[in-house]
A protein has these predicted regions:
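Compositional signal for N-terminal targeting/processing segments
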Residues: 1-212
Length: 212
């Protein structure tokens, strides 16, 4: 299991290195088919609409937080981890499976039009509440010291149960020699042991060592 910070552009090169080093013959990803199809159908139009609103906010003098901007566009664009995994699997001729739930993707993505309304972007992009540095610090506190600084929600539990079962079925069907599952770093927590039957080794892509 490779834990990433969603929307962190600096993580792309690190994820590429981890994939090449691990050399999996099957990759699974915390990404849904609904999310893929939504971006194919509406991503371009949403990015244009958001870009126009952002240009207006900048013209009004709003200081845009770059981390918040990255997080916004990571929701509209194809996730960096999807691009990295797709390119790796194409090069190696191996399977990539999207294993997240469509239900929660549809609920969250169907709010996108409201999210990119100008006044909502004013609040969202003027805040530094979710910086990459803070995400990395939170991850290391948990992975290295066991200090939990984030909630593990019921939604996460349902999604992890779905994803772990899906991965288990895929492993039985395809019998790969090595599987890599790419997910947000919070899913490495797994307080209910939903991935235990898969005997995962866990790593945060910003670290060099495995965090078992």
């Amino acid at each position: 299991m490779l834990g990433v910070i969603h929307g962190d552009r600096d993580g792309r090169a690190l994820l590429d290195k981890w994939l090449e080093s691990a050399g999996p013959d099957m990759v699974t990803l915390e990404f849904s088919h609904y999310g893929l199809n939504f971006r194919l159908a509406r991503g371009g139009a949403l990015r244009q609409k958001a870009g126009e609103a952002i240009d207006e906010l900048r013209a009004e003098g709003l200081r845009i937080e770059e981390d918040a901007l990255d997080a916004l566009f990571s929701t509209i664009d194809f996730p960096l981890e999807f691009t990295a995994a797709s390119e790796y699997c194409d090069r190696r001729g191996v399977h990539l499976f999207l294993v997240d739930m469509d239900l929660f993707s549809s609920v969250n993505l169907n709010r996108m039009d409201g999210l990119i309304a100008k006044e909502n972007l004013r609040m969202l992009l003027g805040s530094d509440q979710c910086t990459r540095g803070r995400q990395k610090a939170m991850a290391r506190l948990f992975l290295e010291k066991g200090i939990k600084t984030f909630p593990y929600t019921e939604e996460m539990r349902l999604r992890d149960r779905h994803m772990s079962e899906r991965i288990g079925h895929l492993v039985k069907r395809h019998a790969p020699s090595r599987v890599v599952h790419i997910c947000g770093w919070q899913h490495l927590c797994d307080p209910f042991g939903l991935y235990t039957a898969l005997y995962p080794k866990k790593a945060f892509i910003y670290d060099k060592a495995l965090c078992v």
